[in-house]
UniProtKB/Swiss-Prot annotation:
PROSITE patterns: RIBOSOMAL_S16. GO terms for molecular function: structural constituent of ribosome. Pfam families: Ribosomal_S16. Gene3D superfamilies: 3.30.1320.10. The gene is rpsP. InterPro entries: Ribosomal_bS16, Ribosomal_bS16_CS, Ribosomal_bS16_dom_sf. This is Small ribosomal subunit protein bS16.
């Protein structure tokens, strides 16, 4: 099953997440199909916290991709900000 989920990056104690479309059987930070955005929970000052390609997200959801709870909330936040 294809899922839209967070893949962790960044340094120790400084998380940075890529929002990726991946097969659910692959590892969290492993192989993915497409990167559709990023989420930086510790953004400071003028740094961007969230960037999401909503058109691609809608495409994948329409084709049966499931979203995790956290990604669903981020999508909702991105739509409200747009």
């Amino acid at each position: 099953m294809v899922t839209i989920r967070l893949a962790r990056g960044g340094a120790k104690k400084r998380p940075f997440y890529n929002i990726v479309v991946a097969d659910s059987r692959n590892a969290r930070d492993g192989r993915f199909i497409e990167r559709v955005g990023f989420f930086n929970p510790l953004a400071r000052g003028q740094e961007e916290t969230l960037r999401l390609d909503l058109a691609r997200v809608e495409h994948w959801v329409a084709n049966g991709a499931a979203t995790t709870d956290r990604v669903a909330k981020l999508i909702k936040d991105a739509k409200a900000a747009a």
